[in-house]
Amino acid sequence: MKLAVRDKIIQRNPCNSITNIKLEEIEREYLNFEEIKQLSETIPITENAKEVARMFLFGCFTGLSFANLVTLTFKQIEGDTVKFFREKTKTWHHVPLNETALSLVGDTAKCDPQDRIFSVPKHRQCSYILEKWGKEAGIKKHLHMHLSRHTFATLSLTSGADLYTVSKLIGHKKLATTQIYAKVIDEKKRRAVNNLPRLEI
């Protein structure tokens, strides 16, 4: 519009009177440890659903995206570390695996290094399975694959990891992206304090 005024196409910029619109931040949902435990105790019976559940839980303890999880092979597991390429940032990442994540992978020695760790259906079917599993487990939140990533970031921060470390673990290029999770935690803390009973003094 400024260029149009400069080039005398229009006389006045109609946007001059418009103030900047601040978009309201959407609070990122995540699962707390009790909810993860709840899910782990109600693993689905069918093979497809079991695999989706295993992949989702692995995501909760590694922060890997759906794209990285579905293509993850056994050769990417190097001891207690998972190595993956993040297409979005065009960089390689190494994420340490804790005991829970390692148990979800299973015995890599007995597997073909080229095989995929998770044999899951297409994204839409995975979403359906997750939604159904969440309802059956009594989880009030909407289960989707990206929720596992939010969960990993938030649980890492609440467990004492600093922002820089978490941003490196989940492959964020900008620290500001990871700060969204820290803000969620701060707001939850503030709400918890505000909900304490009031004492009249």
What do these predicted regions represent?
Residues 6, 10-66:
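Basic, Lys/Arg- and aromatic-enriched nucleic-acid-binding interface segment
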Residues 51-52, 121-123, 140-160:
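Short basic/aromatic active-site micro-motif
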Residues 57, 61-68, 132, 149-173, ...:
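C-terminal catalytic core of tyrosine-transesterase DNA break-rejoin enzymes
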Residues 86-90, 102, 123, 170, ...:
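Catalytic-site neighborhood detector that most strongly recognizes the C-terminal catalytic loop/helix
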